[in-house]
């Protein structure tokens, strides 16, 4: 956690404002609310984004905080997302605390996530909200019957997801399916009060505003170049690399020195190998898992698959955006997989496992330092 917060705060304090993707557009959204009590109309960049993070930022500006402090909202949200990831792993495997440590480490050491958490954007809050949605999803499949507190939690995170960003819809879909399926024989009409009433209270006004302003539940989307079939390989490559390096404010990834590219490629290959081994271990362990644990794993994986699918569909039908941060809202599944591999290795070959884990962590931190230094040279 200290590494994550340290790099996020370093980006927030050292990189001049406006040098993260669309940062000035996000800042203008906040200024509109803070100084004019208005949301951006159609034609203004980022007008399609739900307003939660911008309302929080406007409150800071109205309180007299400097504009750079808006980046700290992202840093705090990023830390909350890491905590939620650890809690997900802890609840899925309560007797294996190493698994939670591995999941948190996976989320905290992603250089691209640290960069996002140091910029003015709605993505860091969306990542955090997505993680908390999936935590509630795990708690739902773990609970034999609905309780007042759990129903309220589900309603609150649903409302938060609906007013944060559309990238939260993938984990939200997993939560809603889990509620309906797992509690299908125990849901009563009275349960609709927290499950539907709280989201309406939290986010309903935003969608009503859209109907009045745009005559549509959602604001008009911004269209651009679409993903073509012959671009698929490059799209996947750039999406994967964006988990491991900063982005330019003009769009696209920042150019790393050769040493950084080598470290990045090693980490991507390692991540791929870890995911494959985690899948193998999951198949082997599946019969021994409790029913609710299987449901939790399926829900987390389904959210990840939906996030990937929605990224492809959006890029093919609206505008091409090979940005891995959009997938981090449902990153609990790969985080859990990484934690499971670590926990399994600690039992089987502790010395080798801890050595390899330490090397991976050191490589990730080195890549974070290279990315930060490269950004400082370019924009500092």
Predicted features and spans:
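Perimembrane helix-loop-helix junctions
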Residues: 142, 171-200
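Membrane-interface alpha helices of multi-pass inner-membrane proteins
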Residues: 150-166, 171-177
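Transmembrane-helix motifs of polytopic, lipid-linked glycan transferases
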Residues: 68-94
């Amino acid at each position: 956690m200290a590494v994550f917060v340290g790099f996020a705060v370093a980006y927030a304090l050292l990189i001049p404002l406006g040098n993260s993707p669309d940062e000035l557009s996000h800042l203008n959204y906040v200024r509109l609310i803070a100084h004019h009590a208005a949301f951006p109309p159609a034609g203004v960049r980022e007008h399609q984004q739900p307003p939660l993070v911008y309302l929080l930022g406007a409150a800071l500006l109205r309180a007299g905080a400097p504009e750079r402090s808006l980046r700290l909202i992202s840093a705090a949200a990023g830390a909350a997302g890491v905590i939620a990831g650890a809690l997900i792993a802890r609840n899925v495997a309560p007797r294996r605390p190493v698994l939670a440590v591995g999941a948190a480490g996976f989320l905290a050491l992603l250089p691209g996530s640290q960069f996002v958490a140091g910029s003015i954007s709605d993505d860091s809050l969306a990542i955090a909200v997505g993680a908390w949605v999936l935590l509630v999803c795990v708690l739902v499949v773990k609970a034999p019957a609905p309780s007042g507190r759990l129903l309220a939690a589900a309603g609150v995170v649903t409302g938060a997801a609906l007013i944060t960003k559309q990238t939260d819809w993938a984990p939200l879909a997993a939560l809603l399916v889990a509620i309906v399926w797992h509690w299908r024989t125990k849901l009563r009409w009275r349960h609709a009060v927290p499950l539907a009433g709280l989201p309406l209270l939290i986010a309903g006004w935003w969608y009503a505003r859209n109907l009045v302003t745009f005559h549509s539940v959602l604001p008009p989307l911004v269209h651009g170049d679409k993903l073509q079939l012959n671009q698929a390989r490059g799209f996947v490559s750039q999406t994967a690399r964006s988990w491991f390096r900063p982005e330019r404010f003009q769009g696209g990834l920042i150019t790393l020195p050769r040493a950084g590219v080598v470290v990045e490629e090693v980490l991507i290959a390692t991540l791929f190998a870890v995911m494959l081994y985690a899948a193998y271990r999951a198949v082997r362990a599946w019969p021994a898992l409790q029913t609710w644990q299987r449901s939790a794993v399926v829900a987390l994986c389904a959210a990840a698959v939906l996030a990937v699918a929605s990224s492809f569909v959006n890029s093919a039908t609206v505008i091409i955006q090979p940005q891995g941060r959009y997938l981090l809202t449902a990153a609990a599944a790969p985080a859990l997989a990484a934690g499971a591999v670590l926990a399994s290795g600690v039992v089987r070959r502790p010395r080798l496992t801890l050595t390899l884990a330490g090397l991976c962590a050191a490589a990730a931190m080195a890549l974070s330092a290279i990315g930060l230094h490269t950004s400082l040279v370019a924009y500092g």
